[in-house]
A protein has these predicted regions:
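TRNA-recognition modules of translation machinery and tRNA-sensing kinases, especially anticodon-binding
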Residues: 2-410
Length: 410
């Protein structure tokens, strides 16, 4: 992990999953994706419209996004669409984490796109949620053998410094570059790098490493994402050449690739994502933390006539955590509860134990699962019965059995 030594500031992730065969229908894909999203706490915009803070909001959040921006069949266009949805529906008034998902069919290609966005969460737990949810979705779709590739371009300060060094490096070697790469240099050095990577040019292996130019904040953020991967025993590799969609995203980038994928085969399923704090600032002139994942099912070639709706059951469990390690452990518990068919509430972005307990009480859940630093070290949880007002320290596997029995899910 020596390449982690020279890191530095913020969060840009890019997930790109290459899946070599589609073994499920469009309906199965959407049903699985929406079930997974809603378990992790994501809602459609309709689920926010009746929120009093949104309905009664008197302060609008203006933006410069046009219909032409949204119509672009690019990451730029898709992200613009999500920002417009956030602003136009007064979701900024919530002043709290907003986990939003949406489904659409791309007009030009008929591909099905489902997007997951997390607003108002600056911490790396937002990226961890998106990575974990994406991996869970892939596993549910039958793609269990995959690896995470990760990189970071850092925040604006980091990216500017890296772009300058990259430009200086390439300008000294223009004679050895192809005409396409030289032409791309006129627009942006990272665009030239993407062309060199596409050509598998020797320079693409010798270019400056973006991880060496990260600010302190970006280095810390990137390390936290890597810690999450280590703690969850997720196979991963650090790839400094992964600079996709640099014009949209900032900070940590990652991809998830099926190990069985052959380079000469077409991919049916694409998963791409990233943090776009700077992008949203350019559109709104407001500092709003934002991370998103776009999952696209390709090769549909027919209109989507029906988007399946899930039958929702009100969760009777709330997961409470305090601390970085407990957040990651809680994320894994939430995923285990998903596999067991137990719906759950959570606020993984919260750093207040009392606020989470109050929220659990307000929601009227029967059980809270509490993971603090002691429980994290001891590899236990506190299972609290909110009705009987008693609690016990218990191993996660025992907790799962008890919940299934008490909630009649065994």
């Amino acid at each position: 992990m020596s390449c982690l030594e020279p890191l530095k500031k913020q969060k840009l992730l890019v997930i790109q999953s290459k899946i070599h065969s589609m073994k499920y229908s469009t309906t199965e894909f959407l049903k699985t994706a929406t079930n997974t999203a809603e378990h992790f706490g994501f809602r459609k915009v309709e689920g926010f419209k009746n929120e009093p803070l949104c309905k009664n909001c008197s302060t609008t959040l203006s933006h410069t996004i046009t219909p032409e921006d949204i119509s672009q069949n690019t990451h730029n266009g898709l992200l613009s669409s999500y920002i417009a949805t956030f602003c136009d529906n007064n979701l900024h008034a919530l002043n709290a984490p907003v986990l939003l998902y949406s489904t659409e069919q791309i007009a030009d290609t008929q591909d099905i796109s489902i997007a997951f966005n997390i607003f108002n969460v600056q911490k790396s737990i937002a990226e961890a949620i998106l990575i974990q949810m994406s991996r869970s979705l892939l596993q549910d779709l039958g793609h269990t053998d995959h690896t995470v590739r990760i990189n970071s371009l850092g925040d604006n300060e980091s990216a500017t410094r890296y772009s300058r060094e990259l430009a200086n490096f390439l300008k000294k070697r223009l004679d050895s570059m192809s005409s396409n790469a030289r032409e791309s240099m006129k627009e942006h050095p990272l665009k030239a790098l993407l062309e060199l990577i596409k050509e598998d040019h020797d320079l693409s292996y010798r270019c400056p490493n973006p991880l060496e130019y990260l600010s302190d904040q970006s280095r810390k953020h990137f390390r936290e994402i890597v810690e999450y991967l280590d703690m969850t025993e997720t196979p991963y590799e650090i790839d400094p050449k992964m600079v996709n969609n640099f014009d949209c995203y900032s900070d940590a980038l990652f991809s998830i690739e099926d190990k069985n994928f052959a380079d000469n085969e077409a991919s049916n399923l694409s998963i791409q994502g990233g943090r776009y704090d700077d992008f949203i600032f350019n559109k709104t002139k407001n500092r709003i933390p934002a991370v998103g994942t776009i999952i696209t099912l390709k090769g549909i070639n027919k209109p989507l006539t029906r988007i399946p709706r899930n039958k929702k059951s009100e969760p009777d469990v709330y997961v409470v955590q305090l601390g970085f390690g407990p957040k990651i452990r809680s994320l894994m518990i939430i995923d285990e509860l998903r596999r067991a068919g137990i719906p759950v509430h959570h606020d993984l972005a919260s750093d207040s134990l009392s606020a989470q307990i109050r929220e659990a009480e307000a929601r009227g859940v029967r059980y809270t699962i509490i993971v603090g630093q002691k429980e994290f070290i001891d590899q236990t949880v506190i299972l609290r019965d909110m009705k009987e007002r008693n609690q016990e320290n218990i191993r996660p596997d025992q907790m799962l059995k008890k919940l299934k029995k008490q909630l009649a899910l065994a």
